[in-house]
Design a protein with these regions (language model features):
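Cytochrome P450
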Residues: 1-187
Length: 187
């Protein structure tokens, strides 16, 4: 709430502003960076990396995003290795860095991949949710007025927005071992 209020305080000083660029984009990135314990100084870098990750999944030429993704992975690995050298702190990244399975740390790839997934999943979906919800509230008669006058429950508005304008239209999953589902083998 505090971060959203700070962002809104900044934009209220402007004559015009963009909901996506000034609120929907930075809010989830800042929050995720704070939860993970990643410095937010490079917020635009992280947004670019997150966008590249999503675009790569849908691209006919996924290799075009490899340079950006390599920079992100290197940056995150460096942070994870630094966290492993120091005592565990209260950040999620520290907990990932110090996580063990059978007395062994997660591999570097596992720790980086988990961090990327957390960052991308929380960022893209929340950015889209905020933008879609505000757009709907402002384009349907009287909804914005009802919303600002507390005639619309925020939780119901969010749930309806997720149902009507979902930020994600598909999920990609990979199995860790071969699975048989109703006679269909999934490698």
């Amino acid at each position: 709430e505090e971060i959203a209020e700070e962002l809104l305080d900044d934009v209220m000083k402007e004559d015009t502003w963009d909901i996506h660029d000034n609120l929907s984009f930075p809010l989830p990135v800042i929050i995720i960076c704070e939860i993970l314990g990643i410095p937010i100084d490079d917020i635009h870098k992280f947004k670019r990396w997150a966008d590249a990750t999503v675009e790569q999944m849908c691209s006919e030429d996924p290799q075009q995003f490899e340079k950006e993704l390599s920079h992100m992975r290197d940056y995150l690995l460096d942070l994870i290795l630094k966290k492993r050298k120091h005592n565990e702190d209260n950040t999620l990244l520290s907990r990932i860095a110090h996580s063990k399975i059978n007395s062994n740390y997660l591999s570097d790839d596992e720790a980086v991949n988990l961090t990327v997934q957390i960052f991308v999943a929380g960022n893209e979906t929340t950015t889209s949710l905020i933008s879609n919800l505000v757009w709907r509230l402002m384009t349907i008669d009287n909804l914005w007025e009802d919303f600002v006058n507390d005639k619309i429950d925020i939780n119901n508005a969010i749930n309806e927005s997720l149902r009507y304008d979902p930020p994600l239209l598909g999920l990609f999953k990979t199995t860790s071992k071969e699975v048989n589902i109703e006679g269909n083998i999934i490698p």
